[in-house]
């Protein structure tokens, strides 16, 4: 069911009203140091108390629920109060579950408290989740139900479930009303570790990035340029990924509204109901949106995406120019941004000109003001490894000095990405240092450069360039099979090969029947 209006505010019967809580929340704000998420979230909450912060489909009542900014801040205070009463102050809390409002509430409460929160991928096996809980030394874990991980014994870890949210809020509200909350008045410091994110890049070993409060506030000006209080966005990223966490926080810097998507199976219905003005995607999701538009007139295509969509922001590998042109045909701007978990997700940003998203062709956006990006050992074209310094740079990997030293040197992140900057501080990513192929001829080839060329061929949805027997080869997925499709691709390949140096030419092209394997964040896996 997707009704025309939101029908109820979540857990509104479990907490005091915002007007009643205002004085308490003003007192709480005085305990948050300035460069903390809590300071900016509560400041914005008091500025827009009646505006919807999040909306979502409530499966229990089969309607659309919402939470206002004022209601959200009140519930954070209530949940934080009860968690502190239970001894959770200073503890590490892991979250396992699909995108839901209770997940969001627990996450934001931890972020606005003296706690460390660890989002985990709910699609992982119990064995893998157990390994990660031990690896990050979690003190407690919150899961979708009491039955989750029921067969797993992890000594010393407390368990809570999102189904207990209402009970916890009522208990916390009683503490606030009686002025017995230890959460009220407890400081949140800029330098404290508040978030730990598991990351393995595109195939490396498991690592846990430690992020401070001040790391997470660096992007606030970017979000305020990108979104305004009239915008409504659709959250598609998984919340175990730094891009999802960024979108979740970005809402609270801006006064805008974010709809928590139930997943791709509901995407068409959600687009029709939510009518988003902006959507944040990874490349695979951008491809899916194009599939939705396929064959439609401009008017019909825009209607299928809700009718109000003005822009799409891609937080992943750079998109081919052909994709940008196809979205532009429907009056939709699409830009790419660059970031990594170790920099809280954001290094570059999209520009907004006259209300429209804009970026230079081929770039992954303009470097965010206050972040220093330089190119190490650039070649004659200015191409080299991308290095990053700034307030957004992480503290290191949890209990992993070796991996920390490999990437973080004197406060500078050595990203392993190869790219260049132009005179306007726009960044262009060419490829990954570790992906560079050394051919039998001794020549170096960056596979991502050739993949960008392959994506210019019509109907190429996915591709992977790799080295085989000392030469360049490629796998291509178009969704079409047969001799005719192979011949079409080979004709296009011959044209491409004539335009590039001999050592870069693709000697073998394989048309594959299934999409390429991907990581949990949507990146194509390289062997």
Residue ranges and their predicted role:
Residues 50-87, 94-100, 104-108, 125-130, ...:
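Conserved AMP-binding/adenylate-forming core of the ANL superfamily
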């Amino acid at each position: 069911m997707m009704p025309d209006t939101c029908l109820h505010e979540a857990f509104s019967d479990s907490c005091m009203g915002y007007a009643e809580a205002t004085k308490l929340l003003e007192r709480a704000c005085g305990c948050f140091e300035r460069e903390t998420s809590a300071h900016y979230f509560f400041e914005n909450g008091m500025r827009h108390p009646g505006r919807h912060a999040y909306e979502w489909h409530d499966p229990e009542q089969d309607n659309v629920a919402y939470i206002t900014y004022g209601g959200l801040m009140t519930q954070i205070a209530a949940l934080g109060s009860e968690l502190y009463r239970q001894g959770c102050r200073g503890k590490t809390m892991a979250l396992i579950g699909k995108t839901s409002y209770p997940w969001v509430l627990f996450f934001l409460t931890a972020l606005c408290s003296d706690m460390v929160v660890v989002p985990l991928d709910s699609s992982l096996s119990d064995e893998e989740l157990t390994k990660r809980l031990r690896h990050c030394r979690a003190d407690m874990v919150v899961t979708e139900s009491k039955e989750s991980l029921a067969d797993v014994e992890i000594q010393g870890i407390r368990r809570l479930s999102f189904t207990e949210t209402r009970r916890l809020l009522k208990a916390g509200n009683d503490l606030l009303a009686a002025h017995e909350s230890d959460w009220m008045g407890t400081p949140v410091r800029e330098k404290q570790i508040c978030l730990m994110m598991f990351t393995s890049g595109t195939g490396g070993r498991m690592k846990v990035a430690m992020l401070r409060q001040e790391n997470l506030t660096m992007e606030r000006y970017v979000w305020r340029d990108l979104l305004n209080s009239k915008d409504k966005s659709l959250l598609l990223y998984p919340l175990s990924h730094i891009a999802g966490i960024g979108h979740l926080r970005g809402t609270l810097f801006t006064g805008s509204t974010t709809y928590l998507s139930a997943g791709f199976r509901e995407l068409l219905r959600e687009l029709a109901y939510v009518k988003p003005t902006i959507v944040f995607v990874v490349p695979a999701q951008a491809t899916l949106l194009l599939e939705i538009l396929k064959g439609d007139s401009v008017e019909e295509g825009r209607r299928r995406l809700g009718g109000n969509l003005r822009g799409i922001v891609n937080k992943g590998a750079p998109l081919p120019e052909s994709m940008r042109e196809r979205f532009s045909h429907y009056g939709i701007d699409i830009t790419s941004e660059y970031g990594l978990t170790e920099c809280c997700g954001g290094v570059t940003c999209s520009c907004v000109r006259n209300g429209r998203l804009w970026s230079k062709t081929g770039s992954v956006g303009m470097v965010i003001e206050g972040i220093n990006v330089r190119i190490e050992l650039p070649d004659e074209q200015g191409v080299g490894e991308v290095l990053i310094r700034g307030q957004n740079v992480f503290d290191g990997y949890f209990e992993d000095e070796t991996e920390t030293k490999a990437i973080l040197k004197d406060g500078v992140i050595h990203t392993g990405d190869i790219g260049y900057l132009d005179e306007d501080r726009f960044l262009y990513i060419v490829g990954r240092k570790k992906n560079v192929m050394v051919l039998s001829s001794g020549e170096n080839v960056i596979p991502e450069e050739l993949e960008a060329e392959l994506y210019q061929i019509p109907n190429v949805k996915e591709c992977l360039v790799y080295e085989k027997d000392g030469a360049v080869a490629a796998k291509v997925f178009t969704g079409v099979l047969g001799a005719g499709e192979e011949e079409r691709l080979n004709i296009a390949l011959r044209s491409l090969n004539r335009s590039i140096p001999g050592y870069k030419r693709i000697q073998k092209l394989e048309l594959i029947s299934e999409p390429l394997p991907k990581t949990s964040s949507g990146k194509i896996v390289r062997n």
